[in-house]
Regions:
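Short beta-strand-to-turn element immediately C-terminal to the catalytic PLP-Schiff-base lysine
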Residues: 4
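Outer-membrane beta-barrel pore domains
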Residues: 7-145
Length: 145
């Protein structure tokens, strides 16, 4: 269940709660709480979200938290610059091998009414001791019909 508020033009806030009940009485129910706030102005947008995920794998105390910050800006008639930062952590480090921060940045070019291409760069920064950062380049394509 969730609720969205738009108190001002361009400003949006959302809260969501989800419950996934375990079919096994010896295991815990999974719970997810997500919040979002964002603003869209003329030629730009910014947003942030926070997520709390309780009892991952139906195990009591296997809790994860994550947050993201992102934005975009028009830099030309058909070009948009965008960036995003994500962070995932676990309570007491139980999931350290999968914990990481990540950065994504790129440009999106609108080539026609139904065609967009977006080259982007991604950097993944694992939190585990001795883990190396990963660097990736992508090109995303959109074809609408």
């Amino acid at each position: 269940m969730g609720a969205t508020l738009t108190p001002l033009k361009g400003l949006s806030m959302r809260i969501y709660y989800g419950l996934n009940e375990s079919s096994d009485e010896t295991k815990k129910d999974k719970q997810n709480l997500a919040t979002f706030i964002g603003y869209k102005g003329k030629g730009f947008s910014i947003g942030a979200e926070y997520n709390l995920y309780k009892n991952d794998g139906n195990v009591k105390g296997n809790n994860l938290t994550g947050f993201s910050i992102y934005g975009s800006a028009q830099v030309g008639k058909s070009t948009e610059l965008y960036a995003r930062y994500d962070d995932l952590s676990s309570k007491d480090g139980w999931n350290e091998a999968k914990e990481e921060s990540a950065i994504l940045a790129g440009l999106q070019f609108k080539l026609g009414k139904y065609v967009k291409i977006a080259p982007n760069f991604r950097m993944s920064m694992p939190k585990a001791d001795g883990a190396d950062n990963r660097y990736m380049g992508y090109v995303s394509c959109y074809f609408g019909f």
